[in-house]
């Protein structure tokens, strides 16, 4: 698992590759 970018809400974080899912609702 990779860390997500700073400021990315945990629910928006794709934990396996550390990508912030910015297109997800509420992100």
From Swiss-Prot:
Coiled coil: none annotated. It is found in: Secreted. Expressed by the venom duct. GO terms for cellular component: extracellular region. Disulfide bonds join 4-13, 8-20, 12-27. GO terms for molecular function: toxin activity. The keyword Secreted applies. Keywords: Disulfide bond, Knottin, Secreted, Toxin. Its main location: secreted. The presence of a 'disulfide through disulfide knot' structurally defines this protein as a knottin. This is Augerpeptide hhe6.2. It comes from Hastula hectica (Sea snail).
């Amino acid at each position: 698992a990779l860390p997500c970018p700073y400021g990315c809400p945990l629910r928006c974080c794709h934990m396996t590759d550390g990508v912030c899912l910015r297109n997800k609702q509420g992100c």
